[in-house]
Amino acid sequence: MNPRRKKRLTLAVALIGGVAAIASLLLYALNSNLNLFYTPSEIVNGKTDTGVKPDVGQRIRVGGMVTVGSMVRDPDSLHVQFAVHDSLGGEILVTYDDLLPDLFREGQGIVAQGVLTAEGKLEATEVLAKHDENYMPPEVAEAMGQKHEKLDYSQQKAPDTK
């Protein structure tokens, strides 16, 4: 092989190796920032199409309805624990150590983002609450499908307490 051809081959191999290294670093960075969406039933039973369950320590997003009566606040800190359920009967405990959104209430839809622990709890780093009675996060609406049950409110007014 003459020196000119050898120099071109070395340059081509180095260029291909550099592109491969950059591509692998890019894919690694994207993979570490990937947050997969799960419903409580999918965390317990696995995804319906693949049966894949999230791994302990994996960063995920969970969407569903806050279970009425499940919220427990620590009186000395911002720590709060509540359960999130879906229409298929799955339920997961969520712990959060920050201020909850103003619109957060039991019985309403939320999306919590955080890390799954070994006990099957979600240590949330962010909690998003729905905005009004008609809004539901797209992932939650799609996952719950037609089985979402709205709360019924009567037109009867509360008695005057004055």
Swiss-Prot record:
Heme binds at H131, Y135. GO terms for molecular function: heme binding; metal ion binding. Residues 30-162 are periplasmic. The chain crosses the membrane at residues 9-29. Heme chaperone required for the biogenesis of c-type cytochromes. Transiently binds heme delivered by CcmC and transfers the heme to apo-cytochromes in a process facilitated by CcmF and CcmH. Belongs to the CcmE/CycJ family. This is Cytochrome c-type biogenesis protein CcmE.
